[in-house]
Amino acid sequence: MTQRVRTRFAPSPTGFIHLGNIRSALYPWAFARKMKGDFILRIEDTDVERSSQEAVDVILEAMDWLDMDIDEGPFYQMQRMDRYRAVVAQMVQQELAYPCYMSTEELDALREAQRERGEKPRYDGTWRPAPGKILPPPPAGVQPVIRFKNPIGGSVVWDDAVKGRIEISNDELDDLVIARPDGTPTYNFCVVVDDMDMQITHVIRGDDHVNNTPRQINILRALGGTPPVYAHLPTVLNEQGEKMSKRHGAMAVTGYRDAGYLPEAIVNYLARLGWAHGDAEIFSREQFIEWFDLEHLGKSPAQYNPEKLAWLNNHYIKQADNVRLAGLVKPFIEALGGKVDGGPVLADVVALVKDRANTLREVAQTALLFYRSDLAVEPELAAQHLTDDVRPGIAALAEKLGALPEWKREAIGAVFKEVLAAHGWKMPKLAMPVRLLVAGQLQTPSIDAVLELFGRDVVLHRLAA
């Protein structure tokens, strides 16, 4: 019977979560969904000084916004300390691990001497038990670290789903500390126990973890576990070609939401940031899940391109349901000082203005003209466009608009043409002053569409001002 696929996302809550981080959640999530398996969220919070609940909340918020649902968790490593300590004790009892009393000063001196001899700095196994070996007496009052007895000789081999076959000689690996003097377990050890207990079958993570993998495999095998399939993703680079990070100016995932990006655009963009399905650039969440596989993960670093993301977001804004968009745009309009209630139906306004917008914020900036409370026209613009010679044309326009049997865009456009023909004017001569009077600004979408949305009463009232 084939084992059920189980993947995990295991972030450390030590800062905000950026696009590179969330991509490491998206791929295992998509693979679990594709394989009808389970996606587990594990919070690796053993760095107590740097971890925070606020950072955990941001992770959960980002995943919820992107609709990356979890099947199990979140599990917190700090709540599993008893389990880790029990496994450490078991390993010592089974002689898979041992206490080491070498002080930090002794270890530093050892490494410095090794460097001076041109050797790789490493623990030399002073306290490692061996047949016939006499160990030094434990120093009084010193709490030891616990080290894993890494295999001697041979190598660790795994077929990485991204990088291919990787082989690391055990001679390159010293005996890893798995528990500190106070008994707290170390990162690499906790990861192994978690992956074993949670029956993780596929570990899809950043390639900064490649060096941890041989150590984790050796510990897992010592505990009787079977190593999962590993897929180490190449780094995501920022615009400058540096590794994406907060230090190098990366924005939090929730920052994209607050800037007016749609979750489906972010998911589509991240899916292509290290994976491909032929030449497909735009695809739905359902298509992504259907197509996703480990074989087509990229082997080279992917570079973030904000213009590409903006282009995708524009596509999804244009395709989105107008009622849904209206609900998303409303807070942006209100943040700009607009009052949506009492104005034109926002979904209709969104339908008019959304096509040229790259973000919801840009939709709001254009839509704001329908919801401004202050319609004061700048004197310079009034002097330029609201001249005495144009007033009769505005009055004629208002009279004909007031007589329209139906307030429709096409009929409004026909009235404009009629007035323009009667006065021998071109459209800007009449449209600009009308824009100023009705919208308070010169830049608007098509004037007939704008007047239709404002409604007859508002338009006639403002033209009479």
Curated annotation (Swiss-Prot):
Cell compartments where the protein resides: Cytoplasm
Pfam families: Anticodon_2 (PF19269), tRNA-synt_1c (PF00749)
Enzyme class: ligase
GO-annotated molecular function: ATP binding; glutamate-tRNA ligase activity; tRNA binding; zinc ion binding
Span of the annotated motif 'KMSKS' region: 243-247
List of residues binding ATP: 246
A Gene Ontology term for the protein's cellular component: cytosol
GO biological process: glutamyl-tRNA aminoacylation
Keyword presence, ATP-binding: yes
Reactions accelerated catalytically: tRNA(Glu) + L-glutamate + ATP = L-glutamyl-tRNA(Glu) + AMP + diphosphate
The entry's keywords: Aminoacyl-tRNA synthetase, ATP-binding, Cytoplasm, Ligase, Nucleotide-binding, Protein biosynthesis
Sequence motif 'HIGH' region, residues: 11-21
EC number(s) given by UniProt: 6.1.1.17
Family: Belongs to the class-I aminoacyl-tRNA synthetase family. Glutamate--tRNA ligase type 1 subfamily.
Quaternary structure and interacting proteins, as annotated: Monomer.
Function: Catalyzes the attachment of glutamate to tRNA(Glu) in a two-step reaction: glutamate is first activated by ATP to form Glu-AMP and then transferred to the acceptor end of tRNA(Glu).
Annotated protein name in UniProt: Glutamate--tRNA ligase
Organism for this UniProt entry: Ralstonia pickettii (strain 12J)
Gene coding for it: gltX
